[in-house]
Amino acid sequence: MHPFHESTVTHDVLYSVGFGLPIIAMVVTEFIRWKLSMDNERELKFYGYDIPFWVQNLYKYFGIFLFGAACSQLTTDIGKYSIGRLRPHFISVCQPIMPDGTNCSNPINFHRYIEVFTCGNEESSKRRLKEMRLSFPSGHSSFSMYTMVFAALYLHCRMNWKGSKLLKHFLQFSFIMMAWYTALSRISDYK
């Protein structure tokens, strides 16, 4: 039986970093490419305003990024709701009671697969009781991997000006390690 832990990487941090870092990387990279005159395409007219090519590129890459994030989330949610694996802290959150009134600590229930039960923990919220069945695939892991791999691949394709190649590789490695840390934290949090 594993205890319930709050998430090491909270939802706020996950979405702030997951959306923020790739977007910052795209803005900075496209602006630098424009300043170094690597993209000398014509400007677009929009309601009488000239839209620089680097802003057009940002719009394109933001769209690709957000579409991919939505697809990743949809795929993860389909997996979560169709498989519905119990989280490792299921017993401490639910404290299941069998139809005969026994619980999991009763020796009669050892080494039995039990499908019919009710949760006896009155203190658990409806949200927590719902989430105890949504262990796999990990939403935190899939979202962080998608966003950070996208950022790393984006930098690989677009950050190709002369200068330090080590900076690009350091940023790519840092992005991937942040996603890896998030995935590992789900294991240590028993999520």
Where are these regions (language model features)?
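Ordered, helix-dominated protein-protein interaction surfaces in large eukaryotic regulatory proteins
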Residues: 26, 64, 68, 77-85, ...
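Membrane-embedded catalytic cores of phosphoryl/pyrophosphoryl-handling enzymes
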Residues: 60, 97-191
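Hydrophobic alpha-helical transmembrane segments of polytopic
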Residues: 15-22, 65-69, 171, 175-178
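Generic local-structure boundary detector
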Residues: 30, 35, 39-43, 69, ...
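N-terminal transmembrane-helix/juxtamembrane module of multi-pass inner/ER membrane proteins
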Residues: 1-64, 74-95, 112-123, 127-131
